[in-house]
């Protein structure tokens, strides 16, 4: 197994899941074109398309609610909240 840092390992794991399951979608603030604030999703939108890796509005409560709705409807969402301090507004969901 190749040695890699944490960012590369997360990117590889997400890529693997997107390849093996067409119901996996990734979304969050700047995760699409930009590749996330820490570049964890870099290149995934180019490889899998904007319908599976896409940006969300700056609304953590909305991100959580959308992820729950996707899950209830058979998708396997990976919702990214940029920083731990931003998760608190999502607790209302």
Task: Describe each model-derived feature in a short phrase.
Residues 1-93:
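Thiamine diphosphate
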């Amino acid at each position: 197994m190749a040695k890699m840092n944490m960012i590369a390992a997360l990117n590889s794991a997400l890529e693997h899941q997107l390849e093996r399951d067409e119901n996996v979608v990734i979304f969050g603030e700047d995760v699409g074109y930009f590749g996330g604030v820490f570049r964890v999703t870099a290149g995934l939108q180019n490889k899998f398309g904007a319908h599976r890796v896409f940006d969300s509005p700056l609304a953590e409560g909305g991100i959580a609610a959308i992820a729950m709705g996707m899950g209830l409807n058979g998708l396997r969402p990976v919702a990214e909240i940029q920083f731990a301090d931003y998760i608190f507004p999502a607790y209302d969901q």
